[in-house]
Amino acid sequence: MAHLGAHFAFRSRWQKTDDELCRHSMSFILHKAIRNDFFQSYLYLLEKIPLVKLYALTSQVIDGEMQFYARAKLFYQEVPATEEGMMGNFIELSNPDIQASREFLRKFVGGPGRAGTGCALDCGSGIGRVSKHVLLPVFSSVELVDMMESFLLEAQSYLQVNEDKVESYHCYSLQEFTPHLGRYDVIWIQWVSGYLTDKDLLAFLSRCRDGLKENGVIILKDNVAREGCIFDLSDSSVTRDMDILRSLIRKSGLVVLGQEKQEGFPEQCVPVWMFALHSDRHS
């Protein structure tokens, strides 16, 4: 009986140890997956969201699709293909946004040593609000890329006046899209970088770098957190701070030519910044 009791005690003790090891192993696996996808941001995300929940919202793959992207796509299926929809119902911010974008673009386009005015690529274009008001007045041709087919279908009507200058529409998620090599004078990326993981944003910026012509520039315009990284559960996006963004830019082989804060937005809004980037091979 004493031997039997010792046997059960031994088995019970090791069962507990096995449970601990399994639990810690699972935590390690989840942690590693998140760190792989959000290598610059994951510690900030884990401060706010428990590990298992964060994994389920981001890195978990269900039916072949990563949940960070699947949830964003579900969100945008409910967004109307209108200017109001593109602005998140803050349509009053559209005019100051357009004006600031035009002025920022002028600093880097036209003239010796600057980007040309041949072809621009509008990434995460939606219905083409930026193309219509910022890019088409400047460039001979514009291409649009967005993951939502409904937005691109509406863009064909929305941009009808300039349809002869719209070269093509690409229905792709940006993590799956590769710009044509050496094709673009300007690649415009606005309010969409937060829908890419750190890993995929780094890779996408690198591919955009390769898509630039000589003296071409990337314009990155997005919300910038005051500190750390903020995860928006409603639309499955992240807002990165300046240090995280600049680190990803640097690692992608790009350098910052200039940056400027968007003015004219309410103080309660998350700050919006514009960055002009080009290949570090031209530095």
Swiss-Prot record:
This is N-terminal Xaa-Pro-Lys N-methyltransferase 2. InterPro entries: MeTrfase_NTM1, SAM-dependent_MTases_sf. One of its GO terms (cellular component) is nucleus. It is an enzyme of class 2 (transferase). It is found in: Nucleus. The keyword S-adenosyl-L-methionine applies. S-adenosyl-L-methionine binds at G124, R129, D146, L174, Q175, Q190. Alpha N-methyltransferase that methylates the N-terminus of target proteins containing the N-terminal motif [Ala/Pro/Ser]-Pro-Lys when the initiator Met is cleaved. Specifically catalyzes monomethylation of exposed alpha-amino group of Ala or Ser residue in the [Ala/Ser]-Pro-Lys motif and Pro in the Pro-Pro-Lys motif. Predominantly functions as a mono-methyltransferase but is also able to di-/tri-methylate the GPKRIA peptide and di-methylate the PPKRIA peptide (in vitro). May activate NTMT1 by priming its substrates for trimethylation. The keyword Methyltransferase applies. Its EC number is 2.1.1.299. It comes from Mus musculus (Mouse). Pfam families: Methyltransf_PK (PF05891). One of its GO terms (molecular function) is N-terminal protein N-methyltransferase activity. GO terms for biological process: N-terminal protein amino acid methylation. It catalyses: N-terminal L-alanyl-L-prolyl-L-lysyl-[protein] + S-adenosyl-L-methionine = N-terminal N-methyl-L-alanyl-L-prolyl-L-lysyl-[protein] + S-adenosyl-L-homocysteine + H(+); N-terminal L-prolyl-L-prolyl-L-lysyl-[protein] + S-adenosyl-L-methionine = N-terminal N-methyl-L-prolyl-L-prolyl-L-lysyl-[protein] + S-adenosyl-L-homocysteine + H(+); N-terminal L-seryl-L-prolyl-L-lysyl-[protein] + S-adenosyl-L-methionine = N-terminal N-methyl-L-seryl-L-prolyl-L-lysyl-[protein] + S-adenosyl-L-homocysteine + H(+). Belongs to the methyltransferase superfamily. NTM1 family. Keywords: Methyltransferase, Nucleus, S-adenosyl-L-methionine, Transferase. The lineage of its organism: Eukaryota, Metazoa, Chordata, Craniata, Vertebrata.
